[in-house]
Structure formats: structure tokens, C-alpha cells
Amino acid sequence: MKALWAVLLATLLTGCLAEGEPEVTDQLSWQSNQPWEQALNRFWDYLRWVQTLSDQVQEELQNSQVTQELTVLMEDTMTEVKAYKKELEEQLGPVAEETRARLAKEVQAAQARLGADMEDLRNRLGQYRNEVHTMLGQNTEELRSRLSTHLRKMRKRLMRDAEDLQKRLAVYKAGAREGAERGVSAIRERLGPLVEQGRQRTANLGAGAAQPLRDRAQALSERLRGRLEEVGNQARDRLEEMREHMEEVRSKMEEQTQQIRLQAEIFQARLKSWFEPLVEDMHRQLANLVEKIQSSVATNSVLSTSVPQENQ
């Protein structure tokens, strides 16, 4: 658990440092393994084509086909991101509730930034279409130049948004795959390059500029460590309370079982005391009846023997 806060802190530092970099690569830096990444790549490829501002692009911009296609690609990307985030939430291991909420909030913020910049791009293309219509066939080269500049800026923003979202989803995925303490080593391995990159960027900063950042990072890490330890202690206390409660329930159940057994034995003894006199009385009556029957049979035998002798 203590190593998890360090990984999260390194990811946060990397994201903060990335905001100060003026240059952004033109290619996405991951392989398209997840459906949301594949959907984003389709959006990215289409945007690259739009940025050429070729005659075909100009024609499709005028009839709204470009904005319609971008809308579909945006919705597909956001839908896949939501589905992937939900899948990770269902797989999330026994992470502390505060950690779970913080990870979800960070992913939600990155997702919102990407969606907002996509929406901004679509609105800018719609604005360009309206401006061209207003020009009524006049020279639109200046409009096209401004749009090209804006598209380059938007492309960089979208690239940063996409990479930030991917990094935060990677942290979320690591937590879902490994759980809390059981996943620390695996999270470190998966995010090792990211942590190293953050360290290198921090080291490259000037000593004067880096020291305040290190101080803030140290203070933040101390707060995170203290909070994580507090949450861990609370979880252990809660587990101990549950164990004591279960032991109390078990004792009560054993006591109730013993009482039921004693009551059953008492009831059995009562039944025996009720029915034994009846059985004994029935035995006596049956014995008397048998004795009477035997006596009667003997008497009849004597009488039947004496009658033939008298006739002779």
C-alpha cells in the first residue's frame, strides 16, 4: 500500500511536467489494444486527413459531412472509454474507498478534458463553414490559414489529453488487476517507464525551479502516506470488530443449540414418563386376558372329555 502512493505521485508529477512542454509528437505513443484506443485512433486518422484541407476536405466541410463524421467518431470514442472505465471498476480489487474515489475522479477529469477539446474542434469546423458561406465565393485563403493554425493547436491539445487519459487508465487498470497491497509490485513494473520518465524530467529542471516542486511533492507524499496508513489502520480495526462479532454470534448459536438439546431431552423424558405407565397397564391387561383365555380353554377341554365317558 505504501508503494501505491509513490506510483500515483509519480504519475501526477509526469502529468504536471508535461503541461510545460511546447512540443507534442504527432503519433499516439501506445498500441491500439483496447477498443477505446482503436476508436480514438480512427478519430485521430480522420483528423489528420481533415488537417490537410485538401479540395475534398473543403467540399465536405461545406456540406457538413466532416462535422457529422467527427461527431460519430467522438461519440464512439467516448462510449468506448466509458465502457472500459466501467469494466475496470467492476474488476477493481480491495482498494481503499478513498483511493478508489480518487482514481475514478482523475480518470473522469481526463475523460472530460478530451471530450471538451473534441467538442471545441467540431465547433471550430462548424464556425469555419459558416464563415466561408458568409464570404459568398470571395477569397477564403486567410480563413483557411487561420483554420490550419487552429487545427495544429487543437491537435497538440488532443494529443496531450489522449496521453493523459491513457496514463490514468493505466493506473486504474493496475489497481483493478492487482488490488491494494497485492498489486504494488505489478503496478511498479507496468508504470516503471512512466516513473523513470518523470524522474528524468524532474532531474532536467534547474535546481532553483525543481526545488519548490520537490518540496511540494515531498509534502504531498507525506500527506498521502499518513492518510493511507490511517485508512489501513481503520480497515484493520474494522476487520477485528467483524471477527469479534462473528465469534459472539458463534457462541450464541452454540448456546442456543445446547438449550434446544436440553429441552428435547426434557421433552423426551416427559413423554417417557407419560407413556410408560400406559404401556405397563396394557401389558398387565393383556396378560390377564391371556390367562383368562387359557383358563377358559382348559375348562372347556375338561368338560368335553367327561361327557363321552358318561355316555358310555
From Swiss-Prot:
InterPro entries: ApoA_E, Apolipoprotein_A1/A4/E. Residues 202-282 are annotated as: Lipid-binding and lipoprotein association. Heparin binds at M154, R155, K156, R157, S221, E222, R223, L224, R225, G226, R227, L228. Residues 258-312 are annotated as: Homooligomerization. One of its GO terms (cellular component) is low-density lipoprotein particle. Keywords: Chylomicron, Endosome, Extracellular matrix, Glycoprotein, HDL, Heparin-binding, Lipid transport, Lipid-binding, Oxidation, Phosphoprotein, Repeat, Secreted, Signal, Transport, VLDL. Sequence repeats lie at residues 72-93, 94-115, 116-137, 138-159, 160-181, 182-203, 204-225, 226-247. The modification Methionine sulfoxide is found at M135. It holds the Pfam family Apolipoprotein. APOE exists as multiple glycosylated and sialylated glycoforms within cells and in plasma. The extent of glycosylation and sialylation are tissue and context specific. Glycated in plasma VLDL. Residues 150-160 are annotated as: LDL and other lipoprotein receptors binding. Belongs to the apolipoprotein A1/A4/E family. Homotetramer. May interact with ABCA1; functionally associated with ABCA1 in the biogenesis of HDLs. May interact with APP/A4 amyloid-beta peptide; the interaction is extremely stable in vitro but its physiological significance is unclear. May interact with MAPT. May interact with MAP2. In the cerebrospinal fluid, interacts with secreted SORL1. Interacts with PMEL; this allows the loading of PMEL luminal fragment on ILVs to induce fibril nucleation. This is Apolipoprotein E.
